[in-house]
Curated annotation (Swiss-Prot):
The lineage of its organism: Viruses, Viruses incertae sedis, Naldaviricetes, Lefavirales, Baculoviridae. This is Occlusion-derived virus envelope protein E66. InterPro entries: Baculo_ODV-E66_core, Chondroitin_lyas, ODV-E66_C_baculovirus. Residues 573-582 have a biased composition (Basic and acidic residues). Pfam families: Baculo_E66. Component of the polyhedra envelope.
Length: 664
């Protein structure tokens, strides 16, 4: 019978107990065998790692030369990752250190040293050393290291007792460590070493899988779609920490999923939903929008490109506000904002990426190099409006001892897609960045067009803000000569930045170059005057094109008839109560009838659509490019994006939205 039926007997026979023990041992042996056979494959899927380590072991009690792991949490994390990397080398047949006796002894001695330096019992609401924010090294990285080393050394040294003791103390439950309860992505990582510890205790996989907290984690990795909260949402965007588009957590946990399938059944993980989720944000090169990756500021994952086969095309998450395009020439992705979706999440050590997450507007050309951000450069990226600090990233600290998410105080966003083009427009107010703006982004065959309109500083500024158009990292890409002359047509690393004026509107500032030696970057920028931004009239307009296609681009931007503008009463627009009453009033208005739509001249939206614009002053514009895109009266769930009108060489974007669905 099942283990459950056996365990309910008052006094199991010696034979049944022996059978249970044998079954449990088989589960442990099978798991360790599978783990060893797939070690290199799974390690290659692991985002956080030190691959092919060469750091010298030491005999001074610190495990590795140059590290102080028993006092420095950063060094401790480096030590754990290095041990994992050496364990992989030890079990990789093609590696020079394959089954090396000296390496085996050093790995064994390192775990023994770890055991004698850790406090037992584990601290509560505090890391063993360092700040509270350093918990991650001890709750996630360390148990993975202990598991990895114990399995790698099987047949050479037996670390079972030490591994059991460490995991028991620091992972007493799959969702609990150091006195803190963990959920979602963290729990996915913690649960696997916990299950291994239970196998070392002699439990079977079936018995482990029946534990309530393990069942909770298995429920998470089943990846059912959810309407709100943690998990894969109905539009396939992944959320963690309730309101954060935290695909990085999913990426960091991806390597564990096959282990769960091996232990608990091949259908534990819903790979279809997982595929759609990864496809929404990723690319074959591993690039992704920074807001969908880690809090330390990143546009590249060294494993994301290896998870699935990415198809070219355009995909969007209507309610989570994500738009992604993949073409043979470039990858593009932009995120919008919604009232209950965090535009930024900070922790005690990562607090300078708010602008990067909220305002990155760029393309990643297929033939361009990818340079990940340095700590000094996180605040400088294409699309970022510099309105608080011109020379270094803006710091927006966490409000707790752990992570804090930040929501926009006003947000409306809508997106529309075809097979070869995508558009996103939004109005957003970001208190922590002292900004409110309207944003219009169009991805087409040749690259990206972008317009910021009605840019406003919430608190007046005394300097001229500017929008970053292109960035040259002079440290990581020092082989490319420094920029010396500004131009309204500037090419760098496969991307050509192109300046646009708007017909029937005041000319915009020419691009200018700014060099920041202390940061190690040069920026191509478009300046907006302080007077304009203080008055809420700042404008920036440019294209980022694949360099090989730039010469054939014929984009022009046209400000339409003034009668297409509609403004709200200023007092009503700037007050929360007025905004709410306005939105309620708009919901009562009737949508334009099909008859009204049929009899409207091409290029002009029905008047009743204009009256439903919740954005206040909304700048319709026409984008002429060599694109063949067809999308009429696009409807994305409850979001209405009217008059994405297409002719052979003309895409007229007249983005008029109802309030229904714009915020969510």
């Amino acid at each position: 019978g099942s283990f459950a039926s056996v365990s309910q007997r008052a006094e199991p026979t010696a034979a049944s107990a022996a059978a249970i023990a044998e079954l449990a041992n088989l589960d442990l042996d099978d798991f360790e065998r599978y783990y060893t056979l797939t070690l290199l494959e799974k390690f290659n899927q692991k985002a956080e790692k030190i691959a092919n380590p060469t750091r010298q072991f030491s005999q001074d009690g610190n495990v590795f030369a140059g590290l102080s792991p028993w006092s420095s949490p950063v060094d401790f994390g480096t030590c754990m990752h290095t041990l994992i990397g050496y364990g992989v080398r030890f079990r990789t047949p093609a590696d020079a250190l394959y089954l090396n006796d000296e390496l085996a002894f050093n790995l064994y001695a390192a775990i023994v040293e770890l055991y004698y330096n850790l406090p037992f019992p584990a601290p509560v609401n505090q890391a063993p050393w360092g700040a509270q924010a350093d918990w991650y090294h001890f709750s996630i990285t360390m148990p993975e290291c202990v598991q990895n080393t114990c399995i790698a050394l099987r047949g050479f040294y037996d670390l079972s007792d030490i591994a059991r003791a460490i995991i028991d103390a620091y992972l007493p439950a799959p969702t609990f460590s150091l006195g803190w309860q963990r959920t979602a992505g963290n729990a996915m990582r913690m649960c696997l070493p916990y299950c291994y510890g239970q196998l070392l205790h002699g439990l079977s996989a079936a018995e482990i899988g029946a534990q309530p907290e393990v069942r909770y984690v298995l429920g998470l990795i089943a990846f059912p779609r959810v309407a709100t909260g943690n998990g894969i949402h109905m539009d396939f965007a992944y959320f963690d920490h309730t309101d954060v588009r935290a695909t990085a957590y999913l990426i960091n946990s991806y390597f564990t999923f096959s282990y769960y399938n091996f232990l608990f059944g091949s259908h534990v993980v819903n790979m279809d939903n997982l595929y759609r989720c990864i496809s929404l944000v990723g690319s074959a090169r591993g690039t992704a929008h920074p807001a969908l990756l880690s809090r330390n500021g990143s546009q590249f994952s060294n494993v994301l490109g290896h998870f699935i086969a990415y198809a070219d095309g355009v995909v969007s998450a209507d309610f989570s506000k994500i738009l992604t395009i993949r073409t043979p020439r470039y990858f593009g992705s932009v995120v919008g904002q919604a009232p209950n979706v965090a535009y930024y999440e900070a922790d005690p050590t990562n607090n300078t990426h708010a602008a990067l997450w909220a305002m990155t507007r760029k393309i990643w050309p297929a033939d361009g190099a990818v340079f990940n951000y340095r700590a000094q450069t996180v605040g400088f990226e294409s699309g970022v409006i510099l309105a608080s600090n011109l020379n270094e990233p803006v710091v927006v600290p966490t409000t707790t001892t752990s992570t804090s998410s930040f929501l926009p105080s006003l947000a409306h966003t809508a997106a529309a897609t075809t097979q070869s083009a995508g558009a996103m427009c939004m109005r957003v107010r970001l208190e922590e960045l002292n900004l409110e703006f309207y944003s219009y982004t169009l991805y087409h065959a040749g690259g990206m067009f972008h317009l910021y309109d009605n840019v406003k500083a919430l608190a007046p500024v005394s300097f001229n803000p500017r929008c970053v158009v292109l960035v040259h990292d002079t440290v990581q890409n020092s082989s490319v000569p420094a920029w010396s002359v500004a131009s309204n047509l500037k090419t760098y690393n496969g991307t050509t930045a192109k300046h646009h004026n708007i017909t029937n509107a005041s000319s915009l500032a020419n691009f200018s170059i700014r060099t920041l030696p202390a940061v190690g970057v040069q920026t191509l920028e478009q300046i907006m005057s302080a007077d304009a931004v203080n008055a809420g009239l700042g404008v920036s307009c440019f294209s980022l094109l694949v360099a090989s296609e730039a010469a054939t681009d014929t984009t022009s931007v046209i400000k339409m008839d003034v009668n297409t503008f509609r403004d709200l009463d200023a007092k009503q627009r700037d007050s929360a109560g007025g905004e709410l009453s306005h939105r309620r009033a708009q919901r009562r208005q009737l949508s334009p009838t099909d008859d009204q739509r049929r009899h409207q001249p091409l290029g002009r939206p029905p008047h009743s659509i204009l009256r439903q614009d919740p954005f206040g002053p909304l700048l319709p514009f026409a984008h002429r490019a060599q694109s063949q895109v067809g999308l009429h009266y696009a409807r994305r769930r409850r979001v209405r994006l009217r008059q994405l009108r297409v002719q052979s060489v003309s895409i007229q974007l007249l983005m008029m939205m109802t309030t229904q669905g714009c915020g969510r």
